[in-house]
């Protein structure tokens, strides 16, 4: 799949190894290969060139709670709502992030992990609401859901580029918006957008739909499976004891 942006002097031509990720019962992650080229109808402009690729999963609000120990018991003390937190977010670059993108461009386009999420709804008495956002970032980085991949885009002769981004097994179903930015001296001069479709298939799709559309039947089926599994295990151990 190849597409291009419409830009006067430089164009991004992009290819994907796959534009769909299927989540099956044994899904353990996937790797997306992104490759492309920068087409020019004039000599290459002056200035340091940068290539940035982002992949953002579906965004959902999150209530982040801070626990505090009172009388020997951990209780929820403060809550801040993070209203835009991608379930997955990866940023790949061909050079250190700060060297190829100005902060004002990052602020405008929300490219860095820190800019990609925002928090609202912090009560007036909470002075460090930013720490709640930082907690979300820290936790999701540990889960490999948020990734900063500096110097991971290979650029050949300032024209061809490629990179691979690992997507973990615990992906959320939905559209994953992919953006490619071309920068000069930290300013964005070209951008291309596309989408990767992540969806459950087979048994995973059937069980997911059943749990949403017929929760009672799904619950009864789960209970029946649990009872049957317990009976099988009990029968097996009785057989072992008598042999």
Enumerate the language-model features and the residues they cover:
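Membrane-proximal low-complexity regions enriched in glycine and acidic/polar residues
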Residues: 69-168, 172
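Short solvent-exposed capping/turn motifs at the termini of beta-strands
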Residues: 38-40
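Short, aromatic-rich amphipathic segments at membrane interfaces
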Residues: 166, 189-220
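A short beta-turn/strand-edge loop motif at beta-sheet boundaries
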Residues: 42-47, 171-173
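Extended, hydrophilic extramembrane loops/domains of integral membrane proteins
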Residues: 170-200
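Juxtamembrane interface at the cytosolic side of transmembrane helices
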Residues: 216-243
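N-terminal edge beta-strand
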Residues: 9-26
